């Protein structure tokens, strides 16, 4: 190496874009580089001595597993750690190494945006494939169902004993029930009539409908951005989307009750389905219920997937389909005590 002035370790750590922490076995912070201070929104002086989990609303890291790996003399890596600070969710790749004097070095790197985008695209493709499969099956069910209903009607007219028509009545009623289920599985087949108006009109209709269903221990909060521009949309379809999500939130709260927040904001420079938009509307539905079980999160928008006993699992699948027809997207974050669905609708390129 050429001779000259060499940067010390502090200069190197200060210049890193990755967050670096030195913690003890209790995860109390003894050092935080500038990137970590920015991530945790605290100065190094305030961070010193504070256990890392106390700064976070949610931390998905398996701390016991990390300690076991370090105790065995091995490093530890988790390529997808979620942490939440002041309602801001971050997905990071975390690496841990044992240091002398029982300290632990934690390095946290933001998850690559391209990787996140690829995962979203893969999940979206899988959801479309599942939806197409269900639609194909629904069409196959619908044809013989019509024949079954028609035959039951003819049989009802031919039966001499009125008491026997009770059985054909049951067949017809159950055939109609199945047909309604199939129609819901198929969902809307064509884009609706789009008009340009404030999305808050739709939000207020949803509030009016849900308010009649609210128990006394549930509070519905409206947090609207008055500067949000008007945007082209089908009011009935967006109403159905928001109604499905808000009702899911209400059911998730259960008998314990809680809060549901309906929030609107303007999003800037957003990519939707490969198109870049200067402006988009973001509509959030947030609740403080128990959260979505981790085993359901990857398949939540698939047809027939539900975390509720007796649920059809169609509400979010239909909502995703309707938002796709608006060239928008739905995403969510969830951990115990917090679930938030965000609907993005394009305003202008």
Curated annotation (Swiss-Prot):
Processing after translation: Autophosphorylated.
Residue span, Histidine kinase domain: 136-349
Reaction catalysed by this enzyme: ATP + protein L-histidine = ADP + protein N-phospho-L-histidine
A single GO BP: nitrogen fixation
GO annotations of cellular component type: cytoplasm
Domain of life: Bacteria
Function description: Member of the two-component regulatory system NtrB/NtrC, which controls expression of the nitrogen-regulated (ntr) genes in response to nitrogen limitation. Under conditions of nitrogen limitation, NtrB autophosphorylates and transfers the phosphoryl group to NtrC. In the presence of nitrogen, acts as a phosphatase that dephosphorylates and inactivates NtrC.
Name of the protein in its database record: Sensory histidine kinase/phosphatase NtrB
Organism field: Salmonella typhimurium (strain LT2 / SGSC1412 / ATCC 700720)
Upper classification of the organism: Bacteria, Pseudomonadati, Pseudomonadota, Gammaproteobacteria, Enterobacterales
């Amino acid at each position: 190496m050429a001779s000259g002035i060499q940067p010390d370790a502090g200069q190197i750590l200060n210049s890193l874009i990755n967050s670096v922490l030195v913690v003890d076995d209790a995860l109390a912070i003894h050092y935080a580089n500038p990137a970590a201070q920015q991530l945790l929104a605290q100065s190094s002086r305030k961070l010193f001595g504070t256990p890392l989990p106390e700064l976070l609303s949610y931390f998905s890291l398996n701390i016991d597993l990390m300690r076991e790996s370090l105790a065995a003399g091995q490093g530890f890596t988790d390529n997808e750690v979620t942490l939440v600070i002041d309602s801001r969710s971050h997905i990071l790749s975390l690496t841990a190494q044992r240091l002398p004097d029982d300290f632990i070095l934690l390095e946290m790197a933001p998850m690559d945006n391209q990787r996140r985008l690829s995962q979203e695209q893969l999940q979206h493709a899988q959801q479309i494939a599942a939806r197409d499969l269900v639609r194909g099956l629904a069409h196959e069910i619908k044809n013989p169902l019509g024949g079954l209903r028609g035959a039951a009607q003819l049989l009802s007219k031919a039966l001499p004993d009125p008491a026997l028509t009770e059985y054909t009545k049951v067949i017809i009623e159950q055939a109609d029930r199945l047909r309604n289920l199939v129609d819901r599985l198929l969902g809307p087949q064509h884009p609706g009539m789009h008009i340009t108006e404030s999305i808050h009109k739709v939000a207020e209709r949803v509030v009016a409908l849900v308010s009649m269903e609210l128990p006394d221990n549930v509070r519905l909060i409206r947090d609207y951005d008055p500067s949000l521009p008007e945007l082209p949309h089908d009011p009935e379809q967006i109403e159905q989307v928001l109604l499905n999500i808000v009702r899911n939130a209400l059911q998730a709260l259960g008998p314990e009750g809680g809060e549901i927040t309906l929030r609107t904001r303007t999003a800037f420079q957003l990519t939707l389905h490969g198109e870049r938009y200067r402006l988009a509307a973001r509509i959030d539905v947030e609740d403080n219920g128990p959260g979505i079980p981790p085993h359901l999160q990857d398949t939540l928008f698939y047809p027939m997937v539900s975390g509720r006993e007796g649920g059809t699992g169609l509400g979010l699948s239909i909502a995703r389909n309707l938002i796709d027809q608006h060239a928008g997207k739905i995403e969510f974050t969830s951990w115990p005590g917090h679930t938030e669905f965000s609907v993005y609708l394009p305003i202008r390129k």
